[in-house]
């Protein structure tokens, strides 16, 4: 399918539909309040309602405990877990959680999930703005409404996870890139849009590292298709890239100055190589996962991924004017090059490819716009497409309510992190620091809510005239030689069901902890 198009300003400013084209709208859609009202209700019900329902689940607690550490120690540069630097992810999401929690003085379920809700809302509004600009008010509303109606968004928006914030950064960067190209083609420069796009890429780097892969995985094929690759070497892009890179490098320099080069480099390089390089992965190259990854992504983006089959037809591009074809071309460049890249690397977690879902949904929106305005034949005779779309939106709001009230509260029923944390808090003096060694249970530690520090062994416990409290795994406790008097205060099970023990150490001899 050829999507080559001319770039004359007159072609870009023609309306999407002729005046006589059929419209699925009634007069109330044209009211200035209608779209804001619909999007407010949609975002409020899908993203903000129920922020505080259910305890934090799995790695949500890791993000929250790191955000709480930002608030506690005032260091918003280096993520620290139990006092140790943790560079597996940059500080963006943790800083966002800390910022949302700062007015309340502590991190809660609601404040930990609030950044994802805000990011999801911004993404929906960006889709409405850009699709309205390209396809009209109805088209913008369709794109914004269907964007969050899929399985991935059901789980990730809202949550305390990083992924929704990364989707917002990537989607904003790509949309601003498209505006930069439009401005350049219309002779208006576009420098401010280049700067906005690259700053969003920098925000994505400081959230989850991967934003440049999505951005340039879209920009390079798109510029190549349009014969404008030279823009990557132009002053506007290079100056913007220099600013974005300076922000990221500046953070890295500050982080290294506080922790040392070895800690930073070893963690970041290990994370990158393990996910990108088959030679550094902990298993043989996963051919089956590589082949299955596109299918899994299509399943995660149901029901909208079904619409891609209509969009892939060569005749579909001919249904659109210049603006529509260029938007369709951009969405193709968003989806397929990135899908190829993220399917070929050895790490195939669906959440890493989450920004692709926005591109898929955008293309599905174009199919729905064509169905609704009559340019594409609706395949079902006995029901109108607008009725199906409204019904799906209402169904999804209902599904979200079921998920919030039926699934989320019960996810931690067997783990009981809050209850176990309360038992520990009752046994440990409020002024005491809790120590741990090999234990990895951020759920219990988050709800414990007091200072926790990790040491490399019992022998590194600091000297103190007061009892010291430590949590040990069962094997650690059973292998302890009682060289220092210790007693088990509390036995319980961690979130994975393994036995752990809260121990109290007394009569410690003065010991240099090497700090």
PLM regions: where:
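Short periplasmic/luminal acceptor-recognition loop of GT-C membrane glycosyltransferases, typified by
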Residues: 44, 395-498, 504-508
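Short, solvent-exposed mixed-charge patches
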Residues: 511-515
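Short low-complexity stretches enriched in small and charged residues
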Residues: 33, 52-54, 98, 388-393, ...
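Alpha-helix N-cap/loop-to-helix boundary motif
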Residues: 328, 356, 360, 387-391, ...
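Long hydrophobic alpha-helices with heptad-repeat/coiled-coil character
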Residues: 205, 212, 375, 381-389, ...
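Signature aromatic-anchored transmembrane alpha helix within multi-pass, membrane-resident enzymes
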Residues: 369-402
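Membrane-integral, polyisoprenol-dependent glycosyltransferases
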Residues: 2-376, 406-407, 496-498
């Amino acid at each position: 399918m050829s999507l080559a198009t001319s770039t004359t300003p007159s072609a870009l400013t023609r309306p999407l539909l002729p005046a006589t084209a059929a419209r699925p709208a009634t007069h109330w859609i044209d009211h200035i309040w209608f779209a804001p009202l619909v999007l407010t209700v949609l975002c409020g019900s899908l993203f903000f309602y129920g922020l505080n329902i259910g305890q934090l689940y799995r790695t949500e607690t890791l993000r929250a405990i790191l955000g709480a550490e930002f608030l506690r120690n005032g260091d918003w540069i280096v993520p620290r877990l139990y006092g140790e630097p943790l560079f597996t992810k940059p500080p963006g999401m943790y800083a966002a959680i800390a910022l949302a929690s700062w007015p309340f003085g502590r991190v809660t379920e609601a404040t930990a999930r609030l950044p994802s809700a805000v990011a999801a809302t911004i993404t929906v509004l960006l889709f409405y703005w850009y699709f309205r600009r390209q396809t009209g008010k109805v088209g913008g509303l369709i794109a914004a409404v269907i964007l969050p109606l899929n399985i991935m968004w059901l789980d990730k928006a809202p949550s305390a996870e990083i992924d929704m914030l990364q989707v917002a950064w990537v989607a904003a960067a790509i949309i601003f890139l498209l505006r930069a190209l439009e401005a350049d083609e219309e002779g208006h420069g576009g420098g401010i849009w280049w700067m906005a796009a690259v700053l969003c890429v920098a925000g994505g780097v400081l959230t989850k590292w991967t934003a440049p892969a999505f951005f340039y995985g879209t920009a390079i094929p798109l510029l190549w298709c349009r014969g404008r690759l030279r823009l990557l070497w132009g002053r506007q892009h290079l100056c913007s890239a220099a600013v974005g890179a300076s922000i990221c490098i500046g953070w890295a320099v500050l982080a290294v100055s506080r922790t040392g080069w070895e800690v930073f480099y070893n963690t970041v390089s290990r994370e990158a190589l393990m996910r990108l390089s088959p030679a550094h992965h902990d298993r043989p190259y996963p051919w089956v996962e590589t082949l299955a990854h596109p299918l899994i992504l299509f399943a995660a983006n149901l029901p909208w991924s079904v619409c891609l089959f209509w969009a892939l037809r060569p005749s579909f591009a001919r249904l659109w004017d210049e603006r529509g074809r260029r938007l369709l071309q951009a969405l193709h460049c968003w989806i397929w090059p990135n899908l190829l890249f993220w399917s070929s690397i050895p790490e195939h977690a669906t959440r890493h490819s989450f920004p692709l879902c926005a591109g898929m949904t955008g293309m599905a929106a174009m199919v729905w716009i064509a169905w609704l305005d009559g340019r594409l034949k609706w395949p079902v005779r006995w029901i109108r497409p607008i009725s199906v779309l409204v019904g799906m939106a209402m169904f999804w709001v209902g599904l979200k309510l079921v998920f919030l009230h039926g699934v989320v509260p019960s996810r931690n029923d067997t783990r009981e992190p809050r209850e176990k944390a309360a038992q520990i808090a009752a046994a440990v003096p409020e002024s005491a620091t809790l120590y741990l060694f090999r234990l990895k249970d951020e759920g219990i530690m988050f709800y414990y809510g007091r200072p926790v520090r990790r040491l490399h062994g019992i022998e590194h416990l600091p000297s103190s005239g007061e009892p010291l409290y430590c949590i040990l795994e069962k094997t650690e406790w059973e292998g302890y030689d009682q060289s220092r008097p210790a007693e088990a205060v509390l036995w319980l099970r961690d979130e994975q069901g393994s036995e752990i023990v809260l121990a109290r150490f007394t009569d410690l001899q003065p010991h240099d902890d090497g700090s």
